[in-house]
């Protein structure tokens, strides 16, 4: 038998239904404020596993109460579990989610592929939303996630309306997109800057936002906010967003004040409803009033506003380059008239007959049905002097106070002159409202028998291996680096950037590698969007013929290779996150051969994973950001050719920036290289499947020098003394 709230009618946020207004809730009070202002749903974080670790967040009791409050009022609550999860945390994750699952949690928002698989196994009836932290950029990956049981996708904030439209056309997924609030400079889920600078990982909800500080670009003497975007405000684009197939308008701001959430929610509610109310053919008349725009802008003032990436790939106008003199954040309370918590309208019938128990029947409309309860109280007496009037009874019953309910219609039926003590009437009302609340919330409870699934066992523990027995792989961004790698006998595999192939002249290198029995894999794009789709549409056949395999940095590239029948081995880079055994199994089941170790796990945490096919980076400047923005374009130094520039932070650390014009994105690299030379004890104990030296802007000569140092150490020699600045990354410390 279906629960009262279940229906075939499309609800807000569902494909084919009304657009959902999804608001942030940093506390129970803000949750109630958001619903009163018109939100259809809220997203909230609990004590752990959320991407806002420094927000107030909810206690377990508050979340349970919030779930019930949402359901009483026909709303929804989505829980954020949108961080990467370590292997030893899965027992905690199970215990954390179980009470919310049973309470009737509406969905969970996830980033980690291992967590996605875990929830499918452990909590089969819990809808899964793919977080923007997954960096979903096209219909290929969205469709795959749909097949994996995901019901909603939050695509990367950088994709265009056209790309969103493709996801909508090719899947049945709900599509949730940000319409208001802060924008990151980096593709969400791809930023390691805060992690590497100060140990606070964005992938663990602890971003310190160093990007918001002033930076100095190579071609600009003045410090500016080169890595800080204005806040998003897409209210004028509501018609375009709806036509693109977006089903949920998401407002950013779980660390914002109630006044902000109330004002922004009310404005998007008002103008989404306005657009819905316009008749076909008259929707071009949609306009936002100047007064409402002012109210919306004043709700939070810091960086200025942009309508984001929906209609552009990037642009200098999106940056808050010139910080105002009063750059402190300012939130303005704007009265919308919706400050009071919601009270659900209910109907009641009171039946009072002398000599019989007082009877109260309460009912409430629910989506797809209704809930009804009947309660009885004390025996009604015949009045001897002052009978109770209908007005007295009505006044007493309507004192619902701070409960979730208010009477819409109250039918009072009495026989003759009756009397009942006021405390009896109050008790009858309280009992009735409590039972009605229970009847509504119980309809959302999950009572299925949830059994804890055993953890995925690690394959046979890796035995300690002598350093010299672990093969060396090299990644090269230039032909010169690859040629240098070929001169070192220890090198067994080269990952060659696809941009080298695009420039031509790689064939001789490939032939030489083949003659020396060195494998060459193509290293695919950091982000797979239309530019990458166009490139591989033209070159994949030739690449498949000439390369020995591929290494991918994202799910989209992997799925493209599978779709096109690429039959050679495919490895995954560090950004195809595999923090736990389930995530490793996810990539392995997809067909991955080797998997690069995550850069944010320490040696002990890496030891919890299967290392037999793990690639351990031991040298290299690794990416800390991948951005759709372009530093050279923003500093008016764009040559429309791929190349290098740099930005310098307040501590005079220089971060090299690669402008990758083939795919139109920038990659920012850590200022110091990762160097694990000298960590042979830990490396031998880990016994990874391969070691990796990665080269970015190094010359061919410098590449050869580094590899020669590695070769001597690899063969049992003393670790070289690194004279320049370097980092051990998280190999020793890890992230919290």
What feature does the model see in each segment?
Residues 2-37, 41-52, 64-67, 73-101, ...:
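Surface-exposed amphipathic alpha-helical tracts and adjacent flexible/coil segments at the periphery
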Residues 131-135:
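Ser/Thr-centric signal marking residues that sit
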Residues 58-63:
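Glycine-rich, highly charged phosphate/nucleotide-binding loops
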């Amino acid at each position: 038998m279906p629960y009262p709230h279940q229906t075939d009618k499309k609800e807000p946020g569902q494909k084919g239904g009304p657009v959902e207004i999804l608001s942030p809730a940093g506390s129970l009070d803000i949750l109630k404020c958001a619903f009163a202002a018109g939100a259809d749903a809220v997203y909230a974080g609990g004590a752990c596993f959320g991407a806002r670790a420094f927000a107030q967040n909810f206690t377990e009791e508050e979340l349970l109460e919030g779930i019930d409050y949402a359901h009483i009022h026909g709303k929804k609550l989505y829980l954020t579990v949108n961080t990467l999860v370590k292997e030893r945390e899965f027992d905690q994750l199970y215990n954390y989610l179980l009470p919310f699952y049973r309470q009737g949690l509406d969905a969970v928002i996830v980033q980690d592929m291992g967590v996605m698989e875990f929830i499918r196994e452990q909590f089969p009836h819990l809808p899964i939303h793919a977080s923007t932290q997954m960096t979903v950029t096209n219909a290929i990956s969205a469709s795959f996630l749909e097949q994996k049981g995901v019901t909603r996708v939050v695509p990367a904030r950088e994709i265009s309306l056209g790309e969103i439209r493709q996801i909508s056309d090719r899947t049945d997924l709900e599509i949730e997109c940000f319409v208001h609030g802060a924008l990151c400079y980096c593709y969400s889920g791809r930023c390691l800057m805060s992690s590497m600078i100060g140990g606070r990982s964005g992938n663990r909800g602890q971003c310190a936002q160093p990007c918001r500080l002033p930076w100095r670009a190579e071609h600009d003497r003045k410090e500016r906010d080169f890595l800080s975007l204005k806040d998003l405000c897409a209210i004028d684009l509501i018609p375009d967003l709806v036509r693109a197939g977006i089903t949920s308008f998401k407002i950013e701001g779980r660390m914002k004040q109630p006044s902000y959430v109330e004002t922004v929610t009310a404005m998007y509610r008002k103008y989404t409803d306005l657009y819905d109310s316009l008749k076909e053919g008259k929707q071009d008349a949609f306009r936002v009033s100047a007064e409402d725009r002012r109210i919306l802008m004043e709700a939070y003032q810091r960086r200025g506003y942009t309508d984001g990436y929906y209609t552009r790939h990037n642009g200098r106008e999106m940056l808050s380059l010139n910080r105002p003199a009063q750059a402190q954040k300012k939130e303005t309370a704007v009265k919308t008239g919706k400050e009071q918590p919601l009270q659900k309208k209910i109907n009641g019938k009171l039946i009072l007959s002398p000599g019989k128990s007082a009877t109260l029947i309460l009912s409430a409309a629910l989506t797809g049905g209704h809930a009804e309860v009947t309660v009885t109280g004390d025996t009604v007496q015949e009045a001897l002097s002052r009978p109770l009037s209908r007005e007295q009874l009505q006044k007493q019953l309507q004192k619902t106070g701070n409960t979730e309910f208010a009477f819409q219609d109250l039918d009072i039926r009495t026989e003759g002159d009756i009397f009942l003590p006021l405390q009896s009437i109050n008790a009858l009302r309280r009992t009735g409202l409590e039972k009605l609340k229970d009847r509504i919330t119980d309809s959302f409870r999950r009572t299925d028998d949830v059994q804890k699934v055993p953890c995925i066992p690690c394959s046979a523990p890796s035995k300690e291996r002598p350093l010299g027995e672990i093969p060396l792989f090299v990644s090269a961004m230039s032909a010169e680096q690859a040629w240098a790698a070929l001169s070192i006998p220890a090198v067994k595999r080269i990952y060659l950037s696809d941009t080298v192939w695009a420039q031509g002249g790689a064939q001789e290198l490939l032939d030489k590698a083949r003659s020396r029995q060195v494998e060459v894999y193509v290293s695919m794009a950091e982000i797979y969007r239309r530019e990458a789709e166009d490139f591989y549409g033209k070159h994949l056949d030739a690449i498949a013929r000439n390369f020995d395999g591929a290494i991918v940095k994202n799910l989209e590239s992997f799925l493209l290779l599978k779709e096109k029948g690429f039959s050679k081995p495919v490895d995954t880079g560090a950004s195809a996150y595999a923090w736990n055994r389930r995530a490793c199994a996810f990539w392995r089941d997809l067909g991955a051969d080797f998997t690069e170790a995550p850069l944010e796990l320490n040696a002990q945490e890496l030891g919890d994973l299967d290392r037999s096919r793990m690639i351990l980076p031991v040298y290299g400047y690794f990416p800390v950001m991948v951005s759709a923005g372009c530093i050279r374009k923003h500093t008016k130094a764009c040559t429309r050719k791929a190349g290098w520039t740099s930005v310098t932070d307040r501590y005079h650390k220089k971060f090299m920036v690669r402008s990758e014009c083939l795919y139109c994105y920038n990659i920012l690299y850590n200022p110091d290289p990762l160097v694990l030379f000298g960590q042979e004890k830990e490396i031998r104990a880990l016994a990874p499947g391969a070691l990796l030296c990665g080269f970015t802007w190094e010359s061919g000569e410098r590449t050869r020098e580094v590899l020669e140092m590695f070769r001597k150490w690899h063969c049992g020699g003393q670790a070289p003394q690194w004279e320049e600045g370097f980092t051990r990354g998280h190999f020793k410390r890890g992230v919290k």
